[in-house]
Amino acid sequence: MGARVKVVSEIEKIMRNIDQIRNIGIIAHVDHGKTTTSDSLLAAAGIISERIAGEALVLDYLNVEKQRGITVKSANVSLYHEYEGKPYVINLIDTPGHVDFSGKVTRSLRVLDGAIVVVDAVEGVMTQTETVIRQALEERVRPILFINKVDRLIKELKLPPEKIQQRFVEIIKEVNNLIDLYAEPEFRKKWKLDPNAGMVAFGSAKDKWGISVPQVKKKGITFREIIQAYEKGKEAVAELSKKMPLHETLLDMVIKFVPNPREAQRYRIPKIWKGDINSEIGQAMLNADPDGPLVFFINDVRIEKAGLVATGRVFSGTLRSGEEVYLLNAGKKSRLLQVSIYMGPFREVTKEIPAGNIGAVMGFEDVRAGETVVSLGYEENAAPFESLRYVSEPVVTIAVEPVKIQDLPKMIEALRKLTIEDPNLVVKINEETGEYLLSGMGPLHLEIALTMLREKFGVEVKASPPIVVYRETVRQQSRVFEGKSPNKHNKLYISVEPLNEETITLIQNGAVTEDQDPKDRARILADKAGWDYNEARKIWAIDENINVFVDKTAGVQYLREVKDTIIAGFRLALKEGPLAAEPVRGVKVVLHDAVIHEDPVHRGPGQLYPAVRNAIWAGILDGRPTLLEPLQKLDIRAPMEYLSNITAVLTRKRGRIINVETTGVMARIIAAIPVAESFDLAGELRSATAGRAFWGVEFYGWAPVPDQMLQDLIAKIRQRKGLPPSPPKIDDLIGP
């Protein structure tokens, strides 16, 4: 304990000096050794004893992770390191590497300035590595590389020194290609990995040694010596970790190549914050000014016994306990009750945290990850950090019910808390059946959520088999339909058509949003998606499933007064479409004309909602409607001789092969496969390749369900939801 107490006061002192702070994360494909690497760093910072570093897996402090051996929650730790005689504080934010949790990865990247990319020397760059490098570069986070598990090249593959070096060159080249592909021009050259400059480390996190090219020269070590150490056995390998400790190599590299927070914020803020850079707040963030107005971005929220703990980065100003602040997304005031810094999974209370640092706060009641907190008085002119875009969308649903009926209130509360901790989980109640539906990014994501319900919240639940979430859409423009209100006093004339891919992509990437300036938005849509500029200016709403509402009317009386009601009706109508009560995606709803009653009593939601819904639904049914199913992208690597077996499995599961590459004896297959077919995929691939294939999955997109399956699928979904077997007819919706 002594060392740690000493470190808190030391750390508080250094936190004031921004040149001596670094904010980094470790990103990697699942099982490439990210947590073990974090452990070696923790051991070195004196928070855990060195002896247990490899086994302790301190960052994996939830039991779930121990059993599965994969990290689920991003935790933060402050490390202490001396470099060239100067003390530094390094905030290390742990990020999950498993595809199902990529929402958390995106969120942690926003608070980092640099990332150690960990790559398994044998497996090389995998899909997930590629995804996280791309995301890091999009957030202007500088990557440095650690090639891990070099012991596998020596022990399993028994490669000679020159072959080992050749493997390193291949991996560095692959990562540099990604930097070429995804980095913005101004960073491309500077951030390219140069091993001779020391931007790449090689080693084994499990055996706690690591080395870089400059160190090889300085310490006069050769790879032949490292190979010999493994031939000699445990003690010789332990010597390696004394001679060239991994933490020293990695943390030296971090201090040398990752910018300090002020330097990083100068080029990162214009990219990740969409407010006015010339405003007082904008300037304070560019300069990471501890005396400026407070801006604190929350990237992680946990529920603990004492309440909600919100972790994030102070971009400007200083977090002080007891101060009153404003939450931009929630739109309300709150008080900072307790401010603390992290050490391992533990927090140490401190009085204040200046700009550039990562800290944790208690006292916010219903804060969500992605919130921006500012000083009181600045709520009017401070923009929130971008509404976070996640790479995946929830695509699999299970129905959950408590084993003991009296646990229902407890389960409902636990589900509410789970969705606060993980915004990628969505909870809905099926009004008809009273079921609680939990949707997530994949079977594993939901499995972990169920385990959390049991272990963290103590609720025993039964879950239905996983159900795939579909979307409804149209394939052609519909006719114009008249939607009448029940009292016949209001009429809306509406048609529905598909949005083009360009528009969908712009909305998905956050380039086009609902709260944008209409002129800017219209310009982007006209330039990049072929919209008519005047029509694009008349967009009223864009909902979360990428549907757009356009008002093409001219001079309709009382329309302004009911605009909000019509928009709410549009959102409701598309939450559950007419085919199978699934969310509608990718449609443009156009209002051509309307007759609105002059008396507000006769034009309330009860009258307008049905009119909007019936006209939109009729339009959908008239526009060659279909269901879209979610696809997963698979990245499979296996020995060449299993290629035909793998292809057979994929074809049987309606998979589509996108690309096949072969290097030496290995084949890499990139394919897209419907999520509906992927539940037993792991088992089938294992048996088809005698367990020698490894693969990654990520969300790929939506595609129309094959026509021959459509009617059957609609009937099945409707039956499951307790709806009449066939969808409504147009005449049922807009009768005479």
Curated annotation (Swiss-Prot):
Entry coiled-coil feature ranges: none
GO cellular component annotations of the record: cytosol; ribonucleoprotein complex
Kinase in keyword set: no
Subcellular location: Cytoplasm
PROSITE patterns: G_TR_1, G_TR_2
Keywords recorded for this protein, A-Z: Cytoplasm, Elongation factor, GTP-binding, Nucleotide-binding, Protein biosynthesis
Sequence ranges assigned to domain tr-type G in this UniProt record: 19-262
KW ATP-binding (keyword) present: no
Binding site for GTP: 28-35, 94-98, 148-151
Residues making up the signal peptide according to the UniProt record: none
NCBIfam families in the cross-refs: aEF-2 (TIGR00490), small_GTP (TIGR00231)
Function: Catalyzes the GTP-dependent ribosomal translocation step during translation elongation. During this step, the ribosome changes from the pre-translocational (PRE) to the post-translocational (POST) state as the newly formed A-site-bound peptidyl-tRNA and P-site-bound deacylated tRNA move to the P and E sites, respectively. Catalyzes the coordinated movement of the two tRNA molecules, the mRNA and conformational changes in the ribosome.
Family of the protein in this entry: Belongs to the TRAFAC class translation factor GTPase superfamily. Classic translation factor GTPase family. EF-G/EF-2 subfamily.
Protein name, entry field: Elongation factor 2
Source organism per UniProt: Aeropyrum pernix (strain ATCC 700893 / DSM 11879 / JCM 9820 / NBRC 100138 / K1)
